From Swiss-Prot:
Pfam families: CAF20. One of its GO terms (cellular component) is cytoplasm. One of its GO terms (molecular function) is eukaryotic initiation factor 4E binding. Residues 115-129 have a biased composition (Basic and acidic residues). This is Cap-associated protein CAF20. Disulfide bonds: none annotated.
Amino acid sequence: MVKYTEDELLEFQEIAYNPQPQVLDAFNQMVDEVREHANAEIERQKHLKWSNGDTYIDENGNERPYHHLNRRRGSRSGAKPNLKRKGAESVTVDDDGWATLAKPKKSFGAEEAGEERTKFRDSLKDGSVKARPNNKNLGSSKAVDPRDAIADKNTISFNAFEALGDDSDDDDE
């Protein structure tokens, strides 16, 4: 089969005989539509590479993809935000122009419950508080005698080398 370049085909098109030009025009129109469809498909594939096809309508009515909202993995190298809220620091300026910074108290009832706290502490000083442990998971509820713990200690240990060296004591008898 003879192969022609594109330029040669364009030259032959002008001098070629075409008995049915409407068929050729319909064929050329179909080729153009297929070419446009292929280009649109390539663009759609490029677009789908960066998103999964899900879109939403923004406040202006434009359709936008979600790819800027749900990245696959966020960066862990950046600083994490400090989510603890700090109380408002109040600055008081006196007559001389000195500014004093008053930090908020850390406990909520620091000054209101002062009397109740001292009353509770005084009641504890007067008598002894007996605490009973929860013996549900313990082996025995019997109180431990400290003298038993001392008696369990080994005070004398047996040394075999000293026993071998002291054969003279046993032989004399």
